[in-house]
UniProtKB/Swiss-Prot annotation:
Record keywords: Ribonucleoprotein, Ribosomal protein
Pfam families, A to Z: Ribosomal_L34
HAMAP family from the UniProt entry: Ribosomal_bL34 (MF_00391)
Native organism: Methylobacillus flagellatus (strain ATCC 51484 / DSM 6875 / VKM B-1610 / KT)
Signal sequence segment: none
Record-given protein name: Large ribosomal subunit protein bL34
Keyword Signal found: no
Primary gene name: rpmH
GO CC annotation, single: ribosome
GO molecular function annotation: structural constituent of ribosome
PANTHER family per the UniProt record, alphabetical: LARGE RIBOSOMAL SUBUNIT PROTEIN BL34M, MITOCHONDRIAL RIBOSOMAL PROTEIN 34 FAMILY MEMBER
Amino acid sequence: MKRTYQPSKTRRARTHGFLVRMKTRGGRAVIAARRAKGRARLAV
């Protein structure tokens, strides 16, 4: 059985990237929360 995590930069960015987050209201909330917390990386 192969492992479940098969890294891909493209897929990672397309599902968890900044632009994807900004598309939905919930995603923007995530970015806002991470900004408020002072995260160095807001999204991938």
